[in-house]
């Protein structure tokens, strides 16, 4: 029997955790976020890699990121995350979640 692939850890920044904890349990976004967490646990590269020249300076200075990814939810919301590696393990760190409008503001579109 083949070995089962190890799942990635999915964590959130302090800001994301505060945002997520404020979402009511019955809000459809909460369910959608849980679905995305599951997807990223299985494959941390499911999102779209954001080119370095588009990274907001805030992420570089605050989180010292080495990569940046975006995952667009069905609702149009986006999560921004970075992938950290430790030995053979990957950790997905969700930095922020945005509506489309707020995402465009953060990235200067």
Where are the predicted features?
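Arg/Lys-rich, positively charged N-terminal/basic patches that mediate binding to nucleic acids
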Residues: 1-42
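Enriched for short, Lys/Arg-rich terminal
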Residues: 1-7, 18-22, 65-109
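Short, charged helix-to-loop "capping" segments that act as catalytic/coupling loops
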Residues: 24-30, 54-64, 85-89
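General helical structural elements
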Residues: 33-34, 58, 74, 82
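A short, surface-exposed loop/turn module that caps and links secondary-structure elements
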Residues: 42-71
């Amino acid at each position: 029997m083949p070995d089962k692939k190890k799942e990635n850890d999915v964590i959130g920044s302090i800001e994301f955790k505060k945002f997520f904890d404020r979402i009511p349990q019955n809000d459809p976004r909460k369910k959608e976020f849980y679905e995305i967490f599951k997807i990223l646990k299985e494959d941390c590269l499911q999102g779209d890699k954001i080119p370095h020249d588009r990274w907001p300076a805030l992420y570089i200075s605050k989180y010292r990121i080495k990569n940046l990814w975006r995952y667009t939810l069905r609702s149009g919301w986006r999560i921004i995350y970075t992938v950290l590696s430790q030995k053979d393990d990957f950790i997905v760190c969700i930095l922020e979640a945005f509506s489309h409008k707020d995402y465009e503001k953060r990235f200067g579109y």
